[in-house]
Amino acid sequence: MRLRHVVSSLDLTRDDYFRIFELADKFYDVKKLNYLSGKVVSLAFFEPSTRTAQSFHTAAIKLGADVIGFASEESTSIAKGENLADTIRMLNNYSNCIVMRHKFDGAALFASEISDIPIINAGDGKHEHPTQAVIDLYTVYKAFGEIDGRTFALLGDLKYARTVNSLLRALTRFKPKKVFLISPSQLKVRREILDELNYPVIETENPYDVIQEIDVLYVTRIQKERFVDEVEYEKVKESYVVDLKLVNMMKKDGIILHPLPRVTEIDRRVDKTVNAKYFYQASLAVPVRMALFYEVLGDREDD
């Protein structure tokens, strides 16, 4: 069964995740395929992006699709007053799939409800970033050969980081041993997210208390652009720095992930450690997104 939309990490079943991992393995070293020949992908980025936009663009091209779209809201008719619904309807006329990033929570879900073609959420406000969660879990799977039974820790901005919401929700499809949530009190995971989780969760403010238990340390930057109050941002912007002292206390085979971009939350000297996997993680974005495109468009009969 092909995927219809990928708006939330909960749109994927456990089997979907493993099928995407298997496809990503096959696509990793591929130069060019024609699976999506004759298809058009719209990249509708109403909010700025570098890595996500470029990796989706590359993934589509490597599968043989043509790519159209825009990189900011200012370059669209929305700047002239057009509403989002009309923009989505117009893109339906030009393409077979829309990859969408937007500053408002729930924008991708709204688009999926009016679109006749698949919507892939490339990040909507502080809500979700489901394809990043697939990349995150694929990296864990490649490192350990499994996801079940592993101990995770998410560190940093757990309130505004949409990658955190998607990863926590994605983990409900697996059986982690436990998940530590490490953040300042002002940046804790929102209660409505915690209420959805079906695995053991422990909240703390001190990474040193739990670092020796962790298999996967997932670090996020403080989301400056989500803060309404600049003063509040200044209070927490350097709450945590993953440095060599902390890393040296990790398990030898423990891994450090980061969805990027990194600011100051990981000391650059950590980059050379065996635990640092965030650049490898980034290298998996294209094959994972190729797999996702294949799942929503490959071998799909036109309506």
From Swiss-Prot:
Its EC number is 2.1.3.2. Pathway: Pyrimidine metabolism; UMP biosynthesis via de novo pathway; (S)-dihydroorotate from bicarbonate: step 2/3. Keywords: Pyrimidine biosynthesis, Transferase. It catalyses: carbamoyl phosphate + L-aspartate = N-carbamoyl-L-aspartate + phosphate + H(+). Carbamoyl phosphate binds at R51, T52, R101, H129, Q132, L260, P261. L-aspartate binds at K80, R162, R221. It is an enzyme of class 2 (transferase). GO terms for molecular function: amino acid binding; aspartate carbamoyltransferase activity. It comes from the Archaea. GO terms for biological process: 'de novo' pyrimidine nucleobase biosynthetic process; 'de novo' UMP biosynthetic process; glutamine metabolic process. GO terms for cellular component: cytoplasm. Belongs to the aspartate/ornithine carbamoyltransferase superfamily. ATCase family. HAMAP family: Asp_carb_tr. Catalyzes the condensation of carbamoyl phosphate and aspartate to form carbamoyl aspartate and inorganic phosphate, the committed step in the de novo pyrimidine nucleotide biosynthesis pathway. PANTHER family: ASPARTATE CARBAMOYLTRANSFERASE, ORNITHINE CARBAMOYLTRANSFERASE, MITOCHONDRIAL. Heterooligomer of catalytic and regulatory chains. This is Aspartate carbamoyltransferase catalytic subunit. It comes from Saccharolobus solfataricus (strain ATCC 35092 / DSM 1617 / JCM 11322 / P2) (Sulfolobus solfataricus). The gene is pyrB.
